[in-house]
């Protein structure tokens, strides 16, 4: 059991140290207005190439810092909360996979790589919700997975629509999206995807169901990953939504969700 406890503590210290480092770096990026855009050519075959892009600015670094901070605290809490669990190794690895999927989503300015992180969140979320392997967990996991599939379909439609413009790097088209009705459709689809991840009405039913997972998982799912993924996407597409009636619609839906959550509490 000492080995398992050390395994949790190693993950805690590792994530906490990276979180503090990223927070300090994000402050430097914010004050000096630095942005790093990195392209990594994974495969090149004659005229075809597969390029992975990463965007490092103060916003992405600060979000990664907060995600790692909350995740490290959840793992530290799991050290004692799940001390008697025989599968705690598997549990910690699933949580770390969750964090990696979220970081993949945050640093990607490309809708394809965002979809990889997005589906990674959905898959690991399903594995965590059904962790206890009983009928209640299976039903909750299926509800969580199916609710988030709607957002996946919306993101796939946005990817298909961006084929018209020759690139999936949405970061280059944000100014164009403000004045182009067709590009606003992409913003609307991304907003629909964010609503499913953030459990807004009418997709909020999966959030109480996710409590079938172990308590640390529920805290992680609710606070630092799934909900934050939707919020982060909306922040990136903020310029598009602010010039459209969808912003008022989103405000209404979020207000209704808060009201319903208050009644439920």
Curated annotation (Swiss-Prot):
Q: Tell me which GO cellular component terms the UniProt record holds.
A: mitochondrial inner membrane
Domain of life of the source: Eukaryota
Question: InterPro entries this protein is in?
Answer: ND/Mrp_TM (IPR001750), NU5C-like (IPR003945), Proton_antipo_N (IPR001516)
Known EC number(s)? 7.1.1.2
Where is it located?
Answer: Mitochondrion inner membrane
The outcome of changing residue 32 to M is: In strain: Chil
Report the principal subcellular site. Answer: mitochondrion
Q: Which GO MF terms does the UniProt record name?
A: NADH dehydrogenase (ubiquinone) activity
Keyword annotations from UniProtKB, A to Z: Electron transport, Membrane, Mitochondrion, Mitochondrion inner membrane, NAD, Respiratory chain, Translocase, Transmembrane, Transmembrane helix, Transport, Ubiquinone
Catalyzed reactions: a ubiquinone + NADH + 5 H(+)(in) = a ubiquinol + NAD(+) + 4 H(+)(out)
Q: Classify the protein's membrane topology as the record does.
A: Multi-pass membrane protein
Transmembrane regions: 10-30, 50-70, 92-112, 113-133, 153-173, 183-203, 215-235, 244-264
Q: Do the record's keywords include Mitochondrion?
A: yes
Q: What PANTHER family has UniProt attached to this entry?
A: NADH-UBIQUINONE OXIDOREDUCTASE CHAIN 5
What is the role of this chain? Core subunit of the mitochondrial membrane respiratory chain NADH dehydrogenase (Complex I) that is believed to belong to the minimal assembly required for catalysis. Complex I functions in the transfer of electrons from NADH to the respiratory chain. The immediate electron acceptor for the enzyme is believed to be ubiquinone.
Indicate the family of this protein: Belongs to the complex I subunit 5 family.
What protein does this entry describe?
NADH-ubiquinone oxidoreductase chain 5
- Tell me which species this is from: Anopheles quadriannulatus
